[in-house]
Amino acid sequence: MILGLDAPTRGHATIDGRPYAGHRAPLTVVGALLEARSLHPGRSAYHHLMALAHTHGIPHTRVDRVLALTGLTHVARKRVKGFSLGMGQRLGIAAALLGDPATVVLDEPVNGLDPEGVLWIRTLLRSLAAEGRTVLVSSHLMSEMALTADHLIVIGKGRLLADTTVDELVRTSGGASVKVVTPEADRLRTLLRGARCTAEAPDTLLVTGLEAPEIGRTAAAHGLPLHELTPQAASLEQAFMDLTRDSVEYQGAPA
C-alpha cells in the first residue's frame, strides 16, 4: 500500500507528502525490495541497474557505487539468470539503494543470504538508519529483528496489534520468568502462591509472576537450598507469538 501496489480499504499512504506514484523520480525518494527475482534473466547486474538509473535520471556513477556496496562488483557483468538466491537478493538491495533514497522499504532482506550476508545486511540497515534515513523492514525472523529493529509494528488479520519499541513489547509480554533449581522443588512450588510454576525437571522450576529476589527470600525464610536462581528474559519471538496467537491465519495440528 505504501508503494501503491494495493489499495487500502480506507485512508491513504504518502511519502514526503505525496503518493509514491506522484513523485517524478520515485527511486530517488523511496527504494524498495519486494521480489528480488523479478529481473530480466538475460541482463547483467550492471545493465539492470543502468536501465533503472537511465529511466529515473540517476547518475550512472551510482551504479558502480551500489554494486560495490552490495559486494557484486566482481559479478556485475554476469547474467542474472545464473545468480543464486542470495546474489539476487543483493542485486535487489542494490536497486533499492540506487537512487540514494531517504526512505527504504525492504521485504525479507536476509532471505537467501549466508551468515556473512545476514551480518552484512544487519550492519547496512543500522548504518542507513544512522544516516537519518527511514528504514522499513518486513520480516518473520524475530531473532533477527531483535538485533536490528528499534520500533515494531505488528499486524494480524488486518488489525494493528502493536506499535511500540522492541524493549517495550518484550517487557509487557508477561513472558519473563525465573529459573529455579532446588532439591525442594515441590515444597517451593507450594510456597510460591500467586506465581505460575512449571516443572522443567524434578529439581527445576520455571517461575512466572514473581521476581528473583522475592523467590530467594521465600526460599531462605523456609530453609530451602537453591542451586540456581536465574532471571530469564522473554524473547521477542515469544512476545510476538503470544501477541499474535489469535491472529494466525493458518494453524497446523500439534506434532
Which residues does each PLM region occupy?
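ABC transporter nucleotide-binding domain
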Residues: 121-210
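A short linear hydrophobic-aromatic micro-motif
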Residues: 71, 195-198, 225-230
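C-terminal coupling/interaction segments
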Residues: 211-255
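A generic structural signal for secondary-structure junctions
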Residues: 54-57, 171-174, 193, 220, ...
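Structural motif corresponding to alpha-helix initiation and N-cap regions
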Residues: 60, 77, 88, 163, ...
